[in-house]
Amino acid sequence: MELTPREKDKLLLFTAGLVAERRLARGLKLNYPEAVALISCAIMEGARDGKTVAQLMSEGRTLLTAEQVMEGVPEMIKDIQVECTFPDGTKLVSIHDPIV
């Protein structure tokens, strides 16, 4: 299988998002990379499902709470930016203060 560097990055992010999702389901608190991966993965999948940038920006703030992540993680993540493929092209989705 031949993948472009961008496709490899997306695959790595998706894999990290799955790991984070499973750890969260087991009741573990997520660390910084896991929290970013989970939110980013959900945003990419939402774009694939046909949601708008505005919907994804709004939903991105509701995916995790401070109780679901390790201490200090919400303060470390001020912005998450994900480049997503939409039916009308590639767009950058920015989520400000994603964990409240």
UniProtKB/Swiss-Prot annotation:
Top EC category: hydrolase
UniProt-listed SUPFAM superfamilies: Urease, gamma-subunit (SSF54111)
Keywords assigned: Cytoplasm, Hydrolase, Plasmid
Coiled-coil boundaries: none
Pfam families registered for this protein in UniProt: Urease_gamma
InterPro entries (UniProt xref): Urease_gamma, Urease_gamma/gamma-beta_su, Urease_gamma_sf, Urease_subunit
An annotated Gene Ontology molecular function: nickel cation binding
Catalytic activity: urea + 2 H2O + H(+) = hydrogencarbonate + 2 NH4(+)
GO biological process: urea catabolic process
Subcellular location: Cytoplasm
EC number, as in UniProt: 3.5.1.5
Pathway annotation: Nitrogen metabolism; urea degradation; CO(2) and NH(3) from urea (urease route): step 1/1
Induction: The probable operon is induced by urea.
Protein family per UniProt: Belongs to the urease gamma subunit family.
Quaternary organization: Heterotrimer of UreA (gamma), UreB (beta) and UreC (alpha) subunits. Three heterotrimers associate to form the active enzyme.
HAMAP family on file: Urease_gamma
PANTHER family (UniProt xref): UREASE (PTHR33569:SF1)
Alphabetized NCBIfam families for the sequence: PRK13241.1 (NF009712), urease_gam (TIGR00193)
Protein known as: Urease subunit gamma
Organism of this sequence: Escherichia coli
Lineage, opening ranks: Bacteria, Pseudomonadati, Pseudomonadota, Gammaproteobacteria, Enterobacterales
The encoding gene: ureA
